[in-house]
From Swiss-Prot:
Presequence extent in this chain: 1-54
Pfam families reported for this sequence: Prenyltransf (PF01255)
One Gene Ontology term of the molecular function aspect: prenyltransferase activity
GO biological process, one term: plastid membrane organization
UniProt protein name: Dimethylallylcistransferase CPT1, chloroplastic
Main location: plastid
Length: 303
C-alpha cells in the first residue's frame, strides 16, 4: 500500500514520532482506534490544527496536512453565538504597547468574525463590547472606547449585516447615540447575519428593565399576573432573538461577567486562552468543532 489517508481530530501533543510497527491509539488521534505504521519513522507536527486530513505517503515518507471545511457539520452548526471579546489590553501590554492599541482591533476583528460566520451559516452573533461595569475604568480609556464604537457605521453599513445595539443607550454620548440610530436604520433591511452589539449592557440591567416593564404593564391593566411567564419575560429582554447556542470567551478567563445572564441558561460555554486580537478563523472553527461534539440535553436525559 503506497499511501494511507486518516481522518483525525486535534492531536493531543504537538509532535509525534511514528516508528516502524508502532500502534497509535486514541490518546494521540482522538477518533482513531488504532493505526499501524509499517515503514520508517515519520515526524508528525500538528500544533494548532483542528480536525484535519493527514495523508501519509509511505514511499516518500512525506506527510501532508489539508484543512477541511467539510469537517464542520452543517446540521449541528450553532445558530447563535455569544462572544465575550476579552484580552485586548493584555495583547497590547504583551507587545509593549499602550492599551488603546489593543482596543483598536475590536471593530475590525468583529467584522472579520462576522464575515467568517456568515460563510459558515451562523445566523446571529451577540458581542459584548462595553459593560455597565466598564465605566469604572479610567476616563481616558472609556472616552477612547466610546469614540471608537462610532466606527460601527463605517465598518458595517455596507456589509450586508443587520446591526442591533442592546444596552442603556441614554447614558452614551449623543454622537454615539446618533451613530447607533443611523447604523440600525441603515442596516435593518439587510438579510445577512444579525450582529447584536451589547454596549453599556449588563445582565442585571437587562433583567431589571424587563421586570420594570412587566410591572408597569400590570399596574396599568395591560396584563394580569397570571400572564407573566418565561415567554413574556423573553419578549421584554432587550436581546429579542433566540438564546445563544454557544458562548465563546477569548482571553483565558472562565466567567460570564454579567453578560446575558437570563439568556445563557442552556448555552454551551467555550473558553480559549487566545486573546481577542489574535482570534481568527481557525480559532472560531475549533470552538464550533468543540460545540458539535457535545450532547445538549436541556435538562432532560437521553440514555
Amino acid at each position: 500500500m503506497s499511501s494511507l489517508v486518516l481522518q483525525c481530530w486535534k492531536l493531543s501533543s504537538p509532535s509525534l514520532i511514528l516508528q516502524q510497527n508502532t500502534s497509535i491509539s486514541m490518546g494521540a488521534f482522538k477518533g482513531i482506534h488504532k493505526l499501524q505504521i509499517p515503514n520508517s519513522p515519520l515526524t508528525v507536527s500538528a500544533r494548532g490544527l483542528n480536525k484535519i486530513s493527514c495523508s501519509l505517503n509511505l514511499q516518500t515518507e512525506k506527510l501532508c496536512y489539508e484543512d477541511n471545511d467539510n469537517d464542520l457539520d452543517e446540521e449541528l452548526m450553532p445558530k447563535h453565538i455569544a462572544l465575550i471579546m476579552d484580552g485586548n489590553r493584555r495583547w497590547a501590554k504583551d507587545k509593549g504597547l499602550e492599551v488603546y492599541e489593543g482596543h483598536k482591533h475590536i471593530i475590525p476583528k468583529l467584522k472579520e468574525i462576522c464575515d467568517i460566520s456568515s460563510k459558515l451559516g451562523i445566523q446571529i452573533i451577540t458581542a459584548f463590547a462595553f459593560s455597565t461595569e466598564n465605566w469604572k475604568r479610567s476616563k481616558e480609556e472609556v472616552d477612547f472606547l466610546l469614540q471608537m464604537f462610532e466606527e460601527i457605521y463605517d465598518e458595517f453599513s455596507r456589509s450586508g449585516v443587520r446591526v442591533s445595539i442592546i444596552g442603556c443607550k441614554s447614558d452614551l454620548p449623543m454622537t454615539l447615540q446618533k451613530c447607533i440610530a443611523l447604523t440600525e436604520e441603515t442596516t435593518k433591511g439587510n438579510k445577512g447575519l444579525h450582529l447584536v452589539i451589547a454596549l453599556n449592557y449588563g445582565g442585571y440591567y437587562d433583567i431589571l428593565q424587563a421586570t420594570k416593564s412587566i410591572v408597569n404593564k400590570a399596574m396599568n391593566g395591560l396584563l394580569d399576573v397570571e400572564d407573566i411567564n418565561k415567554n413574556l419575560f423573553d419578549q421584554e429582554l432587550e436581546s429579542k432573538c433566540p438564546n445563544p447556542d454557544l458562548l465563546i470567551r477569548t482571553g483565558g478567563e472562565q466567567r460570564v461577567s454579567n453578560f446575558l445572564l437570563w439568556q445563557l441558561a442552556y448555552t454551551e460555554f467555550y473558553f480559549t486562552n487566545t486573546l481577542f486580537p489574535d482570534f481568527g478563523e481557525e480559532d472560531l472553527k475549533e470552538a464550533i468543532m468543540n460545540f458539535q461534539q457535545r450532547h445538549r440535553r436541556f435538562g432532560g436525559h437521553t440514555y
